[in-house]
Amino acid sequence: KVGVAMGDLCAGLYGVIAIQAALAMRERTGRGQHVDIALLDTMLAMLANQNLNFLVSGEVPTRLGSAHPNIVPYQVFAVSDGHIMLAVGNDGQFAKVCALLGMPALAKDPRYATNAARVVYREQLVKLLGDVLRTRGRDALLAELEAQGVPAGPINNIDQVFADPQVRHRKMQLQLDVGDGTT
């Protein structure tokens, strides 16, 4: 389970989108709209990849944690000083990751050369990559991945989140006067 009530949050967002669409329709046509948002419907929509996989194949998907069901490697990996999310979206990016990790032959191995093959051999590939990634430091590795155009990011704890330069730039943490002289 994730730490927050995702159904409530996502239903609220869907509700706002639906209200905006209804207001736009009213502006264009003069007619109102009925907005119907249900938590169940919202959470079902959040299972987009798993739903489609099931509806197309008839196979019940297994739990994959942070891993993408259709793209490999696309999940959280442990590194020597934390964790990263690695989101390798295509075969070219996979070849770059393999070269960067000193495993260029892996990208030519028929078991891993295409995403379709990597999905079949997910378990073996994730172990191979994980063994190497655990030896690498997070920040240096992320810089190398970024330089190669491979999507990846840090998994931060909450103090790291609020120390992040982008979070600070976006002013996501507000200082509030609580009335007793403290913030």
Predicted features by range, described:
Residues G15-A22, Q50, K96-L100, L128, ...:
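Alpha-helical scaffold segments in soluble metabolic enzymes
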Residues T42, G92, N156-D159:
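Alpha-helix/helix-capping structural signal
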Residues M43, T114, V161-F162:
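Short secondary-structure capping/turn micro-motifs that flank functional sites
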Residues A147-T183:
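A glycine-rich dinucleotide-binding beta-alpha-beta segment and adjacent secondary-structure elements
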